[in-house]
């Protein structure tokens, strides 16, 4: 672990592909690979039952765009991400400031989602939609 880090990642909150064709992705991940997904009314497939991951989800691009920009289409001037990755951190606000001071363009800053998560998002150099978050459900003792 690097001692000079400016922020502390507590754990990987979740990851998965950002999908363009939900049917094809459902067929691969659920039907062929046997992933135990819960399916929401809007077609969002997610699982908190895959060992080694707090959450694995197939996130439709339109839903990622809605979360980041408040509309169903991804902006043409920002590369479309292929996958998402979220890290839970001590302080989303501090982590956001550290990332911005490092030159990262935040797409969303300190947004509170309906399920209680606080998140900031940016595109990584590899083209991933990266979130730094505080996810209360993942912090509760089981």
Residues covered by each model-derived region:
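Core segments of cupin and vicinal oxygen chelate
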Residues: 16-63
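A short, acidic/glycine-rich surface segment
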Residues: 65-72, 139-141
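Short beta->alpha transition motifs characteristic of CBS
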Residues: 59-60, 121, 132-139
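Vicinal oxygen chelate
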Residues: 20-23, 79-129
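N-terminal beta-strand motif that seeds the catalytic metal site of vicinal oxygen chelate
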Residues: 1-26, 82-87, 133-142
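Short, P/G- and charge-enriched loop/turn segments at secondary-structure junctions
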Residues: 3, 70-76
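Active-site beta-strand termini and strand-to-loop segments that position acidic
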Residues: 47-52, 122-125, 135
């Amino acid at each position: 672990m690097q001692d000079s880090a400016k922020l502390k990642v507590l754990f990987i909150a979740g990851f998965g592909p950002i999908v363009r064709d939900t049917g094809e992705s459902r067929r691969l991940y659920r039907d062929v690979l046997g992933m135990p997904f819960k399916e929401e009314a809007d077609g969002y497939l997610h699982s908190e039952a895959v060992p080694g991951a707090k959450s694995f989800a197939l996130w439709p691009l339109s839903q990622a765009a809605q979360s980041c920009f408040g509309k169903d289409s991804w902006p043409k001037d920002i590369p479309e991400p292929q996958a998402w990755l979220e890290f839970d951190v001590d302080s989303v606000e501090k982590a956001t400031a550290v990332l911005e001071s490092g030159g990262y363009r935040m797409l969303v800053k300190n947004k509170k989602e309906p399920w209680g998560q606080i998140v900031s998002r940016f595109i990584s150099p590899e083209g991933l939609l990266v979130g730094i978050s505080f996810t209360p459900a993942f912090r509760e003792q089981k």
